[in-house]
């Protein structure tokens, strides 16, 4: 006999909306978080084939914020932006960092949570998700010996690329005018927080002109100029900006014009975010 998947009105006249909410509460966030993690890793690994640059898979770490429903629980848990005037944003917000493939725009991993938590702390949580034989492009705000050396020294061929800050200071070790090694001092504050950090660390500096005609200096762990040509490294940096379309799609197309997560509690907000991230990769 065929399996009847439709319940008749006599048996079940309808499913109350409260039953759906209760089911979500029972499910929690963990099953969706695990499903996203398993699928994201498998899909990214499969789609990276044939799309590497000189044997390196390419990624970018980028941050964004999402609004949540304005409930007391969400506001207490996630917090909200506070303006210079002292006013607080109308909606609670969560902060999110994603590890995105530059080749496919698929999400490899994501971390998110309280709005007031510093992006650097979220970035540390993403380091383990970055695979070996890879190049990860960062925003200049992540220029930190603790983060970048952690990435570089754990695993095989885990490289980074990041623009220098305007106030970055270093000792130039080579005479080449636009492609040279530099030695930078690790701040006393960083070494106090992490005594394992060295007093100095080295990087390769490459001077480029951006697509907007601005002069920039890129810092990278790709030290061998013959194995990693400067012009090709600059191209990897330019590709990083293409993932901005990922966030636009996630916010405007998947969340709708309201751009606001609908769930009313922190647990269901997290569940909803994992569901949205999973759906984006589909």
Question: Which ranges hold each PLM region?
Answer:
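Single, function-defining residue in the core of a domain
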Residues: 1, 24-27, 34-37, 54-55, ...
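DNA-recognition alpha helix
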Residues: 1-12
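Major-groove recognition helix of helix-turn-helix-like DNA-binding domains
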Residues: 10-27
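Short secondary-structure boundary/capping segments within folded domains
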Residues: 10-12, 50, 88
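Noncatalytic, basic helical substrate-engagement surface that gates or grips nucleic-acid strands
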Residues: 16, 60-61
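A short, well-structured juxtamembrane/interface segment
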Residues: 41-48
